[in-house]
Amino acid sequence: GISDADKLLEEQGIIFARGINAAKLIWVLFISSLIGDIVETIYVLIVGHELMRRSSFVLGPFSLVWGLGAVILTLALSKVKRQNNLSIFISGFFFGGVFEYLCSVFTEVFFGMKFWDYSYMPFNIDGRTNLLFMFFWGIVALVWFRFIYPPLSKTIEKIPPVTGTVLAFIITAFFICNGIVTSMVMIRTTGRKEQPVARNVIEQFIDDEYPNDVVRKLWSNMDFLEE
């Protein structure tokens, strides 16, 4: 079984997901998405006194912006992680601004939805990001490489090899399926204004299970750009 295979590989000194590779990044995506969603939810509860769902997906408490941010941050800044703190901060500052800007453009172009708008804040860039949050991205990069990623990486490497690989495939399949369903719900939601009557079984299912009021509860901070 899987446990026997794990024992055999561990006896041979094989470590799961050593270094930076696909398996480790999948686990980083999963853990960061989950923790990011929890952190955002707590932050909004404390600052806005509101219990707001912050998940990017239809299913589960996963913030894809945090997850992808952690993965891309790890890949993009892996060369500077051993440099001084200022270099890491500056790299994270610019990386975060570009990443947040592109995420905003992507959701608007492909889904017709706006999940955040910083137009009311000073030093914003097209309302998609601003200097304050870019500063936070710099801090996040510094904290990530100095305090979070090293112990997280070691923890992931302690997962039994076969178990870790099997779970990585399951996580990947779940995120892909969840992403497809979420995308279909978003596209149907923005297209419902021009085409209120479902044209096929899939659209009918989405209309039945995810009408506008349900979508509003899923993403209460979202703006429908077509409205």
What does each of the following model-derived ranges do?
Residues 1-227:
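Aromatic-rich, lipid-facing transmembrane alpha helices and their immediate juxtamembrane interface loops
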